[in-house]
């Protein structure tokens, strides 16, 4: 299934929330996410712009396969055309991680982020905070037309929308996630070579 979402970088979270409130959007909540990202030895999924993500959202745990579509660069200089995403809800973060390791996958890295979620009808607006990155806005909707509508409602410049992963945002900021085994708000631990 294609994930339909765009990102706007280097946003002012307070101004975006004021705009969202003025449009009648509802604040859903503030979240702390922890995720473990997996690959096969030699990062074979990464070479296909894909990964397996296990994410604890507090109220649910989601296992996802994600793959960037229409990839032309890995450094954020160009947008992708979309994202393939297949998700299942699982009941136990640690047991699921153990299962993935037992079928031959390896830890790619562990990371954390914080998110403020707003919703207007069927459009989700996520203000994301990641270690060492400026806040950014992610808009997800059921269609590209709805994305365009959301961009217009917020008065954002459509030319500023990006279709790419957080991995690419880190690359744009001179950080290669593959160099790290752990990326949190408290520490960034380099991968052992």
Feature-to-residue mapping (PLM):
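A contiguous pocket-lining binding segment that forms or flanks enzyme active sites
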Residues: 128-134
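A hydrophobic, small-residue-rich beta->alpha segment in the mid-to-C-terminal subdomain
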Residues: 144, 150-159
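Surface loops and adjacent helix of pleckstrin homology
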Residues: 66, 130, 142
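Short amphipathic alpha-helical "recognition" segments used for binding
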Residues: 9, 142-144
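N-terminal strand-loop-strand beta-hairpin
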Residues: 1-125, 156-193
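Short, surface-exposed beta-strand-loop junctions and turns on beta-sheet-rich folds
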Residues: 69-72, 133, 145-146
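Short, well-ordered alpha-helical microsegments
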Residues: 13, 147-148
């Amino acid at each position: 299934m294609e994930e339909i979402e765009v990102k706007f970088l280097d946003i002012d979270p307070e101004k975006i929330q004021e705009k969202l409130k003025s449009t009648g959007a509802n604040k859903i909540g503030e979240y702390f996410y922890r995720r473990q990202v997996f690959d096969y030895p030699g990062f074979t999924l990464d070479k296909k712009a894909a990964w397996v993500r296990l994410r604890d959202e507090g109220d649910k745990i989601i296992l996802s396969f994600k793959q960037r579509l229409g990839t032309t660069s890995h450094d954020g200089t160009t947008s992708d055309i979309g994202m393939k995403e297949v998700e299942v809800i699982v009941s136990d973060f640690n047991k699921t991680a153990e299962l993935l390791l037992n079928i031959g996958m390896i830890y790619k890295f562990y990371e954390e982020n914080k998110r403020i979620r707003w919703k207007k009808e069927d459009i989700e607006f996520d203000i994301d905070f990641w270690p060492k990155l400026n806040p950014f806005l992610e808009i997800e909707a059921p269609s590209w037309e709805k994305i365009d509508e959301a961009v217009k409602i917020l008065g954002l410049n459509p030319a500023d929308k990006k279709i790419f992963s957080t991995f690419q945002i880190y690359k744009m900021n001179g950080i290669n996630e593959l160099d790290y085994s752990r990326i949190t708000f408290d520490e960034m631990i380099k991968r052992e070579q």
